[in-house]
């Protein structure tokens, strides 16, 4: 018997919804990254996208432990000299709810074409509403 290798056409992608209210950022991000890669499935194959679609609601209510609310800093650069800007977690959540979670998950996924395809299956919304009810996502508790 040879090792099973999944083909892209035979992979079934399911939809899950996660309520991030009062959940810790890193714990949610690590579970989401695992499910986006498909490592929770028996048919996991490293070179095939076997992961599921994840919808996260209430991302604006995510928490971080300790003093990371002010200490965790996100950097970005405009490309111009002296164009680096820093934003802490509290300000990032206030201005762009969910972007901190997207950055955390993206850092946990592989870099390259397969990782870029995986991050596209993550849908993050700051509020309780999402436009993916037609896909009938199952509730996932973390």
Swiss-Prot record:
Domain of life: Bacteria
Signal sequence bounds: none
GO biological process, one term: negative regulation of translation
GO cellular component: cytosolic large ribosomal subunit
InterPro entries xrefs: Ribosomal_uL13 (IPR005822), Ribosomal_uL13_bac-type (IPR005823), Ribosomal_uL13_sf (IPR036899)
S-S bonds: none
GO molecular function: mRNA binding; structural constituent of ribosome
Keywords, in A-Z order: Ribonucleoprotein, Ribosomal protein
Subunit structure of this chain's protein: Part of the 50S ribosomal subunit.
Described purpose of this protein according to its UniProt entry: This protein is one of the early assembly proteins of the 50S ribosomal subunit, although it is not seen to bind rRNA by itself. It is important during the early stages of 50S assembly.
Family assignment from sequence similarity: Belongs to the universal ribosomal protein uL13 family.
Protein name: Large ribosomal subunit protein uL13
Organism: Delftia acidovorans (strain DSM 14801 / SPH-1)
Gene name per UniProt: rplM
